[in-house]
């Protein structure tokens, strides 16, 4: 719960690898006590991982049947003037299906945000080698309608958000925003303390977006 307490000043939270068991019920209740009264989850089965979106302001949550068996991996949260895609990507080549969906979905509208465990990055920039599956699909998304908010602010700076058992670091957690939203990106950064303390196996990522301009 300490991690949740540390991010309670946020307006919206996206929690991936969310599994609706007894622990999840405690998490959701704690979030509500912190003011995150509006919640949407993509899974109800206790043995399946999905996405939880929790917000202090109302939104309409949904899943898209266009994703088929992967529909639980993307929570679509429609806020007033902003559409958020909270993602928990599959492994290896299965990621391509989710990338294809997002590339198509983000052609519409100019106020889209993608975030979550994207489970891939760019070769040599977000890892020391070239082991990522579907790195070209991520690059196509970034070069197209959804630039990487972290790279927009920090350039070639290298940070890793997850480490393998072998100790290899990777940046696989991302925020991507519509090009017209780029001037409104005020901050995009990682907090590695939750990962380093083993409260989570991923670093926490934060985006500060001015939405009133």
Where are the regions that the model predicts?
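Short, solvent-exposed loop/turn segments at secondary-structure junctions
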Residues: 19-21, 45-46, 59, 89-92, ...
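Short secondary-structure junctions
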Residues: 35-41, 58-67, 145-152, 183-195
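Conserved beta strand-loop-helix elements of the APE1-like EEP
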Residues: 46-61, 79, 83, 165-184, ...
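A short catalytic or substrate-binding loop motif that flags glycine-/basic-rich loops and adjacent residues
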Residues: 44-47, 67-71, 166-170, 197-201
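Structured beta-strand-rich core segments of catalytic domains in phosphoester-bond hydrolases
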Residues: 18-91
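Metal-dependent phosphoesterases centered on the DNase I-like endonuclease/exonuclease/phosphatase
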Residues: 29, 33-35, 97-179
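Surface polyanion/phosphate-binding segment centered on an Asp-His-Pro turn
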Residues: 191, 195-213
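Active-site beta-strand/loop signature of hydrolases that rely on acidic residues for catalysis
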Residues: 4-23, 84, 105-126, 149, ...
